[in-house]
């Protein structure tokens, strides 16, 4: 068994790729990781790596186990078997409302706040002329949230409630995550096509 503290990003990325083959899901994991690392630097800088890896692995089981009966329960068991600690696994469990795991820590609240928003920001970037996260602005994102036909699978209430649970204004949360994703634009495929 590999102790979680010895699992670096490379090992966690390998775990993601072991269970996730869908390129969009991999990019989503990287997007959430970038947002989580940014929030860790702001709220809990001593644990940036943990926050980042929670973001990276929050949906690693979803590609193979997509039902509410399976995800994130199967992933939590895999992480337990790999030696990840309870607080790491609990954060991942808490991002899915239907698990009933109440979000208590800043890391758990940040994961919930970043998950749906990262997907929505990706969708906003992909409809821009250059398909670039650098073209996305908070005001246009908030306006797009009102268009229920756009990125319809993204839960807007989760985005709003996530920001509120973190104690930040929605516009500030959106801007913060845009900046975080800009820092990872190359790996997200959102650097632009110019």
Regions found by a protein language model. Name each.
Residues 1-67:
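Acidic/His-rich, divalent-metal-binding segments that scaffold phosphate/diphosphate chemistry
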């Amino acid at each position: 068994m590999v102790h979680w503290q010895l699992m670096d990003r490379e090992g966690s990325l390998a775990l993601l790729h072991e269970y996730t083959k869908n390129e969009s899901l991999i990019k989503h994991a990287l997007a959430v990781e970038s947002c989580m690392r940014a929030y860790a630097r702001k709220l809990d800088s001593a644990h940036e790596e943990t926050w980042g890896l929670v973001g990276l692995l929050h949906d690693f089981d979803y590609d193979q186990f997509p039902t509410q009966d399976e995800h994130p329960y199967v992933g939590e068991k895999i992480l337990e078997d790999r030696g990840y600690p309870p607080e790491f696994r609990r954060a991942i469990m808490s991002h899915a409302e239907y698990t009933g795991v109440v979000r208590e820590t800043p890391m758990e609240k940040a994961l919930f706040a970043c998950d749906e928003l990262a997907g929505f920001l990706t969708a906003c970037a992909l409809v821009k002329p250059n398909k670039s996260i650098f073209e996305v602005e908070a005001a246009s994102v908030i306006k797009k949230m009102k268009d229920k036909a756009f990125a319809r699978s993204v839960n807007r209430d989760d985005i709003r409630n996530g920001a509120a649970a973190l104690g930040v204004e929605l516009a500030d949360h959106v801007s913060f995550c845009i900046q975080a994703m800009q820092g990872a634009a190359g790996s997200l495929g959102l650097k632009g096509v110019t």
